[in-house]
């Protein structure tokens, strides 16, 4: 089984804590993109990324500092900050669970393409959906092609917990029968009907990834047993390849670390 999540806009230069870091599989492509981003002035970044002038200046500084110097890198999974990662709570996992996550969990990224949890990275800002100036980078989907998908094992189940914007670098290139894309809904207290709540779903994706890791779930049948932060499997709403989990009362309160960015 391979578990896919995606990167976050908010990042930090996380401490290494003595963890040995690995080299991202597509680092050469990341260097190419970063070198190009460094040529764009703050005003252009503001336009392309829809940023305020102040944030564009900050982003320009972050990009200018980006490099591949080994002792400047941080573990990818500790570098991203956001709802998915607050649900994942990687820092609370045992050493054995972290090793398992490093084997089974992959992070889809606009700059790096795909990352293992303990690949070494530097902070950056580049969402997969951005359309950069210049014909080669207008579409990052064209830039990456099938390179990201080729980093995923050719057989076995793929649990897709990534946003569509990111999973598009993988899903068109693999057999649809391999994909399981869970959906997370919260019951609306007013209508009594399940609905999609963005922040809840993001935290649930992280919690689901954590659960898969700690329980060592490796078959589609076991996925239905997920029962964390208030969610339960809904057999009626589910369909092949898309199990649906519904919570009456969201149990992930206090986990979100959404930031202004």
Indicate where each model-derived feature is located.
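Near-N-terminal "mature-domain entry" segment
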Residues: 1-126
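Internal, well-folded beta-alpha domain core
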Residues: 90-255, 261
